[in-house]
Regions:
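Class I S-adenosyl-L-methionine
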Residues: 1-117, 255-260
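Short, active-site-adjacent cap segments at secondary-structure transitions
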Residues: 45-47, 90-92, 123, 205-208, ...
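Class I SAM-dependent methyltransferase SAM-binding "motif I" and its flanking Rossmann-like core
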Residues: 3, 91-163
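Short amphipathic alpha-helix with an adjacent loop that forms part of the alpha/beta core around
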Residues: 69-74, 155-158, 218-221
């Protein structure tokens, strides 16, 4: 799809990837080059280079619906707006928030050209750095209880462990709610045992990147923060030890005997 000027207002909800600018897609770069406005959370807008003719609209966390409404109104006025998210905009990010605002907003917003531009989400970047821990069935769970109760998070953790999924956790731990990840680790040790491998991948693809693979029995809540992607293997996930560093992977197949 073209992002040329002179076509009226539009919105591109764009994923900036996990951190390395080399992982931003050409489609997202083209949208940013054509944009008149960039809207997003402060650290994500900071990743966009300023230039003449481009207005930057950074905003604080937890104002996603206000941010979405602002972007929609700008586009309704004929502006070319890029709403930026880290990773992929459709994975625990701004695409859903914008469509929530669109659904309840003024009727004229529905005439706006809206496009979602995918990016590399942190889950996939972290998995690639470690090997292939998501090589078989897996699930992604947001551990933040800002938009859902802990009881629902616990239910999903239990069911995922029972089904023997590998599990990828977004937003595992913050300063305001450190107890949630403590409870998560305790529950996983109860359900999966102490030997299950767990990956802590922090600030993946940036200069601050760190990777740690430990057994669940040695995992501590303070190994994670809001910049950390946590991946827990399934019962089939393996570690290949080598001098260049371990490889964490999950085999592609499961026999009928094992599955039964």
């Amino acid at each position: 799809m073209s992002f040329a000027a002179g076509e009226g207002g539009w919105i591109a909800i764009a994923g900036l990837g996990p951190g390395d600018d080399a992982l931003v897609t050409p489609e997202v770069d083209a949208a940013l080059a054509a944009a008149t406005d960039v809207v997003g959370y402060i650290p994500y807008v900071a990743r966009v280079a300023p230039r003449a003719g481009l207005a930057l609209h950074p905003s604080d966390n937890r104002v996603e619906l206000d941010r979405a409404a602002h972007a929609l109104e700008l586009a309704a006025q004929g502006r070319r707006v890029v709403v930026v998210s880290s990773g992929d905009p459709g994975v625990f990010a701004m695409a859903s928030a914008l469509f929530e605002a669109l659904e309840v907003g003024p009727a004229h917003w529905r005439d706006i050209d809206i496009r979602v531009l995918p990016g590399i989400t942190a889950m996939l970047a972290a998995a690639a750095r470690a090997g292939a821990p998501l090589g078989h069935d897996f699930c992604a769970i947001n551990l933040s209880d800002n938009l859902k109760p802990w009881s629902l998070i616990e239910k999903r953790l239990r069911l995922a462990a029972e089904a023997d999924f590998a599990m990828a956790f977004y937003n595992p731990r913050s300063a305001s709610r450190p107890e949630g990840f403590v409870r998560t680790l305790a529950l996983l040790r109860e359900l999966c045992g102490d030997a299950r491998p767990i990956l802590f991948a922090r600030a993946v693809t940036t200069a601050q990147e760190t990777l740690h693979i430990v057994p669940l029995g040695q995992a501590r809540a303070d190994m994670a923060d809001m910049r950390t992607m946590v991946i827990v293997g399934s019962s089939r996930t393996r570690i290949i030890e080598r001098a260049r560093g371990p490889i964490l992977y999950t085999p592609r197949g499961i026999s009928d005997e094992v599955a039964g």
